[in-house]
């Protein structure tokens, strides 16, 4: 790691609220040890630092390695419900997951559709999410 990246990483690991996400990323170039062109772009954002990581996998090791340097006793990672983040939190008691509001909103909408008797209640919560 170069000095600027290392300093940014150290700064990020001192913070307490993060956003995490990942998406497929197609790499055209052949890379030793990787079959196929599907890689993953991971993003870990805190208040002052945004890290973009390219990884050949979408596995739980990527966030576990990234957050290995956390310094705070309690942090929150806002993310989707992907199992890699659940695995991260299971392995680190200082990490609390806060699932993305968009996913929570979908759950409320599904409840309203499936249980009309709870429609008023669910739409009340949806209004608070906005």
PLM feature spans:
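Catalytic center-proximal scaffold of phosphoryl-transfer enzymes
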Residues: 1-130
């Amino acid at each position: 790691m170069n000095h600027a990246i290392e300093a940014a990483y150290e700064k990020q690991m001192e913070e307490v609220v993060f956003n995490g996400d990942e998406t497929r990323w197609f790499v055209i170039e052949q890379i030793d040890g990787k079959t196929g062109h599907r890689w993953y772009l991971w993003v870990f954002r805190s208040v002052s630092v945004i890290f973009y990581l390219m990884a050949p996998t979408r596995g739980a090791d990527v966030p576990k390695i990234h957050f290995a340097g956390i310094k705070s006793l309690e942090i929150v990672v806002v993310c989707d419900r992907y199992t890699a983040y659940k695995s991260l939190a299971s392995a680190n008691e200082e990490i609390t997951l806060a699932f993305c509001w968009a996913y929570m909103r979908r759950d409320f909408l599904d409840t309203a559709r499936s249980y009309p008797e709870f429609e008023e209640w669910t739409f009340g919560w949806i209004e608070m999410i906005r």
